[in-house]
Amino acid sequence: MKKNIAFLLASMFVFSIATNAYASTQSNKKDLCEHYRQIAKESCKKGFLGVRDGTAGACFGAQIMVAAKGC
């Protein structure tokens, strides 16, 4: 159980860094929010194994990033 939680947190951390690097080139907040939403959609559609393949963490991390950016 601890291993799954650690993996989930690591996935969220890595995804948030990747999301920031991808979306940082956008200058318009509307465009930035649209890119964050698209990334969230793509990451939530990937995979089917949940925590074991990291998609649950990526999906959760993407949703948090969209909310954190005020979109």
Swiss-Prot record:
Disulfide bonds join 33-71, 44-59. GO terms for molecular function: toxin activity. It is found in: Secreted. It comes from the Bacteria. Its main location: secreted. Keywords: Disulfide bond, Enterotoxin, Secreted, Signal, Toxin, Virulence. Residues 1-23 form the signal peptide. One of its GO terms (cellular component) is extracellular region. Toxin which activates the particulate form of guanylate cyclase and increases cyclic GMP levels within the host intestinal epithelial cells. This is Heat-stable enterotoxin II. It comes from Escherichia coli. The lineage of its organism: Bacteria, Pseudomonadati, Pseudomonadota, Gammaproteobacteria, Enterobacterales.
